[in-house]
């Protein structure tokens, strides 16, 4: 079998085009002009035929400098006919403008073709025409109609239908011996149920001159794209944490079994996406503080509480089983999750069912295959969890043994004959069941045309399996967070270590690639939490509590000389807290004297104080006030925090003599104390530093990482691009076809108080509120003046806004969002429910999931009605279907 590859690519001096994927090494191509490249090779093909995959790449001096888009590798079927030649004419493939249609969200769920056609039969003289057309659902197919009998003579009734064997690429093989040239044709959209052509492509006729195909030769023409004048595809969905799901059989918390019931409701209401929060194990202390889903101890292991006990087996001891049944009813009747009681009870069940079924499960073929595929993370996770409980701390640095990870020692501990093994194997058993249950939910979702959308947290815990086993990937001497924004005026301190990107780059970001690829087993779309972290991260020193003393990493700090070039005189005292007699009363009121006496000391400058030794950092203050939770202590503690962060510049953590203007300092006393000309000069350098200086630098940082990571799987990529957004973010997301997040009360345009729904980009996800925000009803009651402006200017109503968001108002706002340009409109369960006066929760405050400014938030929100009740809410479900239908979010084609 002879394969002749041909491609046009204009190279620069020293570059060469090579074929990849056909063998272990790339195959060189040849050119005489640096534009037209060819390669011919011989391949052994079995009688039944062979499918080969390949792609093109550019190399220079043996180094790959560019690859074409290869999420869908080129695919060609070679018949087993002896002495056959395939002449393959290709064009370079760039990342498609409509990349989302090539994601598994569309190809495996939304526009899936579960019953594919067979590969077309070959001819002695063949012409294969291939075209990409991903925007075609299973009830339609691509056809070709043209200027001669073999192509239907322009009669759509005689159009030649193409095969979807390699969907979203379509292909047809024509008998070239029956063709007359020149060939003219168009692609058509064929309705398989009605057996009729519904649409012709609008562009001029496609044309092919005589390619002089010889006997025993097949010409393959690929890389065509077919577009039709049909409505833009738009869908809707629901956002709800798994822990918030509630069925009649839930065990006080949502589980993977409940996820199937939520899929049923999505199908019932014609919604296409279910978006959840992270589901990884966050068990640190077994206390309610472990409820924070973004502080995981493993990026792979699922939280045991998500196990559906019903699917794990039935306890043979009927009395014990009855006790669990009673406990299930008690926990399930609670309005909010009792995290500690739920997990304690589920763990009692895990131990009993493992004792009863564990040996059989661990000996099964299914488990053995799972263990081999996942051992790399599963074994360290199981040992970490075992040692965490044995030593009563997740901080592995404090463990008397194994504080430094040693793979060989851990392997010994995991041998079945050791005393430790039963404790470790219990975690294998639980994770296997979780894997099976989520995989079943994923399969169920895909079969029903629903996408499960996961969430990838930006950080990992400093007390986690990854920090223990792979510490070289992390900077453990800093804390990740976010600068001040609408969520938190003091910024956010997540407490996560930051990434050592230089080390990660050396192995091609293998750590991230594995993480994304594992997630793709269960999800067809994902949200990148804080995508800005791939451009730069807000790193906070370990001695700080709030986020105000942080700095962007990586960044370009300023020298003293550069600062002074703006007309601002730099002084060392600007690095120290500015504490003046004049404003202490404003901060501390009746406690001013106490604060001066216990925490401050006078300097040699009149009226100027400094912090006493032992209280010079926010962490020292936090430690002093630990356990003092009365209002007065909190008032004093927070006041001391603000004193300590009242500096004008923050020293760079890496380069001595370089500085960063302190974020948001214009609100603080040190800035107010400046002369007017100094304020103007400082604002000038501040604006340059935070809004212009880093644009190109951060663009390059993101483009080192994100192209490889986002294209390592076929999941649909959605970015959480909220907060302090550098100008370069939009261009990177556009180049990589990443969906943005649009929220009306957090507009991207700084000139607008509220986002304009008709200005949202198509490539975006729009929502009313996120888990970090108040719900629509909660927001309506937070700031009456803002609500009034929204009521008059955005909704266009006259008069006084209602004090509460009525069901009618909520429905109007929901409808407006469904009418937006965004490809996806994903609303929280609470906001969907707000449109029904009978169903919605009478207690608005109970619907809030997280308050970002509260580092000790208890994540315990639950649906106040069951999924069974939801399925029976026929009037409500009818209304949602109607809203979705009339806003064009349930396209038939």
What are the functions of these language-model segments?
Residues 97-124, 128, 175-178, 208-893:
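Catalytic cores of glycan-processing enzymes that make or break glycosidic bonds
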Residues 2-51, 59-79, 133-181, 190-213, ...:
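Aromatic-rich carbohydrate-binding modules that target alpha-glucans
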Residues 76-91:
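C2-type phospholipid-binding modules
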Residues 67-69, 89, 307:
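Intrinsic disorder/low-complexity signal
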């Amino acid at each position: 079998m002879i394969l002749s590859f041909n491609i046009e690519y204009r190279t620069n001096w020293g570059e060469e085009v090579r074929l990849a994927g056909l063998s272990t090494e790339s195959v060189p191509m040849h050119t005489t002009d640096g534009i037209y490249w060819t390669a011919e090779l011989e391949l052994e093909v079995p009688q039944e035929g062979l499918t080969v995959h390949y792609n093109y790449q550019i190399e220079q001096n043996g180094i790959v400098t560019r690859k074409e888009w290869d999420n869908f590798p080129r695919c060609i079927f070679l018949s087993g006919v002896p002495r056959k030649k395939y002449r393959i004419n290709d064009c370079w493939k760039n990342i498609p403008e409509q990349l989302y249609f090539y994601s598994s969200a569309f190809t495996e769920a939304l526009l899936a073709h579960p019953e594919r056609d067979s590969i077309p039969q070959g001819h002695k003289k063949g012409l294969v025409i291939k075209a990409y057309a991903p925007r075609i659902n299973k009830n339609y197919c691509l056809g070709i109609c043209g200027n001669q009998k073999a192509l239907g003579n322009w009669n759509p009734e005689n159009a030649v239908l193409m095969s979807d064997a390699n969907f979203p690429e379509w292909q047809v093989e024509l008998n070239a011996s029956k063709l007359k040239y020149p060939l003219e044709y168009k692609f058509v959209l064929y309705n398989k149920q009605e057996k009729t052509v519904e649409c012709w492509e609008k562009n001029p006729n496609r044309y092919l001159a005589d390619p002089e195909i010889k006997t025993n030769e097949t010409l393959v023409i690929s890389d065509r794209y077919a577009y039709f004048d049909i409505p833009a595809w738009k869908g809707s969905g629901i956002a709800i944490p798994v822990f918030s799901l509630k069925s009649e059989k839930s065990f006080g918390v949502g589980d993977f079994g409940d996820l199937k019931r939520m899929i049923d409701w999505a199908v019932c209401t014609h919604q296409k996406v279910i978006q959840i929060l992270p589901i990884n194990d966050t068990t640190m202390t077994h206390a309610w503080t472990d409820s924070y889903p973004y502080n995981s101890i493993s990026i792979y292991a699922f939280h045991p509480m998500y196990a559906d006990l019903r699917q794990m087996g039935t306890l043979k001891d009927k009395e014990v089983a009855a006790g669990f049944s009673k406990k299930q009813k008690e926990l399930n009747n609670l309005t909010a999750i009792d995290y500690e009681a739920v997990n304690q009870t589920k763990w009692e069940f895990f131990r009993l069912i493992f004792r009863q079924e564990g040996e059989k499960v661990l000996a099964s073929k299914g488990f053995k295959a799972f263990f081999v595929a996942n051992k790399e993370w599963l074994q360290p996770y199981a040992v970490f969890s075992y040692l965490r409980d044995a030593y009563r701390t997740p901080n592995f640095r404090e463990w008397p043994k194994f504080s430094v990870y040693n793979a060989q020692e851990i392997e010994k501990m995991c041998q079945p004959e050791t005393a430790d093994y039963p404790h470790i194997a219990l975690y294998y058993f639980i994770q296997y069941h979780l894997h099976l249950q989520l995989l079943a939910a994923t399969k169920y979702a895909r079969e029903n045309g629903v996408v499960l959308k996961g969430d990838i947290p930006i950080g990992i815990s400093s007390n986690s399996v990854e920090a223990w086993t792979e510490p070289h990937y992390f900077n453990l001497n800093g804390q990740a967070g976010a600068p001040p924004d609408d969520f938190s005026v003091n910024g956010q301190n997540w407490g996560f270590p930051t990434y050592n990107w230089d080390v990660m780059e050396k192995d091609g970001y293998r750590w991230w690639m594995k993480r994304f690829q594992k997630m793709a087993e269960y999800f067809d779309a994902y949200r990148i939490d804080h995508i800005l972290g791939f451009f730069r991260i807000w790193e906070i020193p370990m001695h700080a509590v709030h986020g105000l003393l942080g700095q962007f990493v990586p960044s370009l700090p300023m020298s003293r000389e550069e600062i002074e070039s703006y007309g601002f005189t730099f002084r060392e005292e600007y690095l120290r807290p500015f504490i003046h007699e004049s404003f202490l009363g404003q901060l501390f009121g009746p406690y001013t004297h106490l604060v001066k006496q216990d925490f401050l000391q006078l300097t040699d400058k009149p009226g100027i104080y400094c912090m006493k030794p032992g209280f010079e950092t926010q962490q020292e203050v936090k430690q002093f006030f630990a356990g003092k939770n009365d209002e007065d202590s909190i008032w004093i503690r927070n006041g001391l925090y603000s004193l300590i962060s009242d500096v004008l510049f923050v020293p760079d953590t890496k380069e001595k003599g370089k500085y960063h203007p302190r974020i948001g300092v214009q609100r603080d006393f040190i800035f107010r104390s400046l002369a007017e000309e100094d304020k103007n000069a400082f604002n000038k350098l501040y604006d340059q530093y935070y809004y212009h200086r880093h644009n190109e630098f951060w663009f390059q940082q993101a483009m080192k990482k994100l192209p490889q990571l986002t294209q390592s799987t076929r999941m649909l990529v959605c970015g959480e691009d909220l907060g302090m957004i550098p100008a370069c973010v939009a261009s990177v997301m556009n180049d990589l076809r990443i969906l943005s997040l649009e929220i009306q009360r957090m507009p991207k345009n700084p000139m607008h108080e509220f986002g304009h729904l008709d200005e949202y980009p198509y490539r975006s996800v729009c929502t009313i509120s996120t888990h970090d925000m108040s719900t629509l009803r909660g927001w309506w009651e937070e700031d009456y003046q803002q609500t009034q402006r929204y009521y008059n200017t955005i909704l266009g109503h006259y008069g006084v806004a209602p004090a509460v968001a009525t069901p009618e108002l909520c429905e109007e706002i929901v409808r407006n969002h469904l009418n937006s340009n965004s490809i996806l409109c994903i609303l929280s369960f609470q906001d969907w429910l707000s449109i029904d006066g009978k169903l919605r929760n009478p207690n608005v405050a109970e619907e809030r999931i997280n308050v970002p400014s509260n580092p000790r938030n208890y994540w315990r929100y639950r649906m106040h009605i069951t999924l069974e009740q939801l399925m029976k809410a026929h009037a409500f479900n009818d209304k949602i279907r109607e809203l979705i239908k009339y806003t064009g979010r349930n396209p038939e084609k």
